[in-house]
């Protein structure tokens, strides 16, 4: 287990202030837990989504590139589809136009004990 603390500097006072202000994210067993304003930027710094083409059947090819060591697990509740952006790799997934607008759950990021981070795939584009 590890705690990421978002302090203004590395002084004891700044770290204490950040902890009391709850500017931290817990990390354990490839799972992040913290406030949305802290975990979402970590995901966005780690994973990008890019449309790379279309198949003959009209599906959109999307490259999920993960530059971190955390395997992010995405779920699309509308289709019961699971996707994993493996560490330090690019994962390709194929979706139709409607699926691109769905909201995904990030199964290994918690913003509350009972709630996963939600994100739209195209919002990960840079």
Task: Identify the role of each PLM range.
Residues 1-126:
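Charged catalytic cores and adjacent phosphate/nucleic-acid-binding surfaces used
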